[in-house]
Curated annotation (Swiss-Prot):
Coarse class of the protein's main subcellular location: cytoplasm
Compartmental location: Cytoplasm
EC number: 5.6.1.7
Gene: groEL
Keywords: ATP-binding, Chaperone, Cytoplasm, Isomerase, Nucleotide-binding, Stress response
Protein name: Chaperonin GroEL
Amino acid sequence: MAKDLKFSEDARQAMLRGVDKLANAVKVTIGPKGRNVVLDKDYTTPLITNDGVTIAKEIELEDPYENMGAKLVQEVANKTNEIAGDGTTTATVLAQSMIQEGLKNVTSGANPVGLRQGIDKAVQVAIEALHEISQKVENKNEIAQVGAISAADEEIGRYISEAMDKVGNDGVITIEESNGFNTELEVAEGMQFDRGYQSPYMVTDSDKMIAELERPYILVTDKKISSFQDILPLLEQVVQASRPILIVADEVEGDALTNIVLNRMRGTFTAVAVKAPGFGDRRKAMLEDLAILTGAQVITDDLGLELKDASLDMLGTANKVEVTKDHTTVVDGNGDENNIDARVGQIKAQIEETDSECDKEKLQERVAKLAGGVAVIKVGAASDTELKERKLRIEDALNSTRAAVEEGIVAGGGTALVNIYQKVSEIKAEGDVETGVNIVLKALQAPVRQIAENAGLEGSIIVERLKHAEAGVGFNAATNEWVNMLEEGIVDPTKVTRSALQHAASVAAMFLTTEAVVASIPEPENNEQPGMGGMPGMM
């Protein structure tokens, strides 16, 4: 395919148009008075959302250069979402500000490399300053406040706080769709381990890229499965029972993996293969834990068992299994309660005997997975459209809350970024490096400015007053009042704010140092009508 090239100013201006189109669509959602964006969905009802990364992912522009600019900002939202799980709109607003301001200076003759050095220096100081003003999340109420601010809903904050209280800060919390109108919290027995499906073709929900299995059989083995013939007799029994199967093995590869995927795609049966968790002796112990939790028998050479001789009564069962790219969660395993209690007691005895802190930690993890549970927030709504929107908000709020527990909280509503303005402005630099620092200084004000504008106010007036306010005092756009943000519970997780700033600066610096852009030229469509009977097309 032929390529088209643009250089220097032409290239950057073309990409900037794409940056602005995407950022302008996303930034209308920021703050308590932010608006929603309606996304067209093929073959289903439109999605109404205020989730930055969801909006960003939907945007595909016709002009290839503009599209590349949009994709760069999309990357900011994606990375921030991956690391912190929230703050994608803030990251987008920061990136747009840095790119716009940086491009003005490059056009005026500034050296992009000098600007990049200044941006990097300013962001480093800003992150240190954020950690200095960060406060630990210490109680259930503070956890609820973080969730409530992220979701703009106090009820959601309360559910997340209760869920974390029941399964622990590091416990497993899943979000499901309810059949009713009300949102409810349930705690189900469950186990999660860090292994995902071995092929993306095993997913049952291609939008979320997850595999959900209802009442599956569970095969637990420490063997490698390479030949499909080894498991064919067992799979035939599973097909007759009309139930899905989760295969947990040392490895599923070759002919076995190929045939599982092919049969899954043909609809013959639903099977998901995952690698066994852990390594060495720990793997063996974790497989035994899983077998006890689900009522399975581990198919292993140690017991003289072969896969081809396995039957349904050797398999475990659970009410539900959810498998993502990286994790497998088994909910409501149907193992014998007495066996589970005995296993927990056995592991606790090992904890008492070991002197190694690392071993203690791993053993405690296993106890939590066997004796702990999975909290399930069941989301209810009056319509499908509202349900999807509410579910996205709860997912963001949960991620935000986890981030807050991990790194603490700072004043919300963009206040913390303006609070560290003074510290960043004290950086000693000259020339283009100083200009790079100033680019970050202007960007630190952008989220507050946009929140105010979304509330129908003049952003620059709010920013100027905030610069001279006491630390922690900020503008509550929901009530149009100046309050102590931390006391009012208007907070942001430090991790979310930090990630947004880091990723925005990284992409902005790459953008400003771009000197050439290469785009594919689309092939012209052939509109010529085919001739009849092998004859050339008629004029």
